[in-house]
Amino acid sequence: IRPSRGLGDVYKRQSLMGSGDDVDWRRIFIVLGLTGIGLAVIVKLVLKEPVRGAMELNKGTEIKKPPFKESLKELIKIPAWWAMCFGIAFGSFVSYAKSAFQTKYLVTLDPSFDFQTLVIILGIMNGTTYAAGAFFGARLADKWGKRDVRAYGWLPAISIGLALPVALITWWVPSIEVHLVFATLFLLLIGIYLGPSFAIAQTLAPIHMRAMSTALFFFILNMIALGGGPTFAGWIMDLFKESYNELESVRYAMTVTSIFFIPSVISFLLVAKVLPRDWKAAEERNLKLAK
C-alpha cells in the first residue's frame, strides 16, 4: 500500500462490496446473511408492534393475537393469498439474482468502463426507476381495481410477462450503455407488481392476523427469492464455466434463471381467477371483526 493513500481510500478500494475485484459470490452471501441476522435481533429488541386492526376497529377495541396454528389454518383457506406469495417470490427470484450478478457481468463485459461511474449509475437506476415502477403499479392497480379486483392479479402478470423478454435481451446486448437502457425498463416493470401484491397480502388476511400474514409472506418471499435466486444463478454459473468463458457463463446462467418468471406469471393469473371470491369473503370477515 502506498503511503500517499488515505485509509478511507484503501478501505473504499478493498472493501468487499465496493471494489471491482473478483470476490467469491459465496463469501458475499455469507457476510450479508450474518449482517441480516444481526439486524433482525436489533429490530426485535427496539421496534414495538402496533395495535392490531387500529385502522378498522372502533377506538378502544383491541383484538387478541391468535395462535400460530390458528393463523396458518385461516391463511391456508385463502388460495389467492398463497398464489400471490408464490407469484412475487418467483418474480423476485429472478430480480434478486439479477441484482447479485449484474455488476460482475458489466465489469466482465467492458473492463475499461469506469467502475465508480458504473455503480453510481446503477444506484440511481435502482433508487428511482424501481421506486417509480412500484408507485405507478400501486396507483394503476387501485384505479383499475375499483372496476375489477382481478386487476390486482392481472397487472403483475402483465408486467412480469413483459419483463421476461426484456430480461433476456438485457444479458445479450453488446455494450454497457445498451444494457443500462434495457435494465432501466426491466426495473420499471418488476417494480409494478409490488403494490398489488402487498395490497392482496393485507386485504385478504383477517384483521387480527395481518402481522402474521406479513411475516409468513416475507418468509416465503425470502426463502424462495432471496435465498434461492442468487444461489441458483451462482450455481448455474459455475456449471457453465466448465464449457464457457466468464462473460458467456453469466449470460447463460441469467438466461436460465429468467425462466422462473413463467411460474410467477402463472401464479398471478391464478390470483386473478380466485381473487373476487376471496376478496369478498375478506371484506365480510373483517367487517364482522370490526363490530
Positions of PLM-derived features:
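C-terminal transmembrane helical hairpin of 12-TM major facilitator-type secondary transporters
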Residues: V149-S197
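A membrane-interface helix-boundary motif in multi-pass transporters
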Residues: S15-G33, A151-W154, D238-F260
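Extracytoplasmic gate region of multi-pass secondary transporters
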Residues: I78-F135, I190-L194, F198, A225-A233
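C-terminal membrane-cytosol helix-exit motif in multi-pass small-molecule transporters
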Residues: L34-E56, S267-A272
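Helix-to-loop junctions at the C-terminal end of transmembrane segments
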Residues: A134-V149, M237-D238
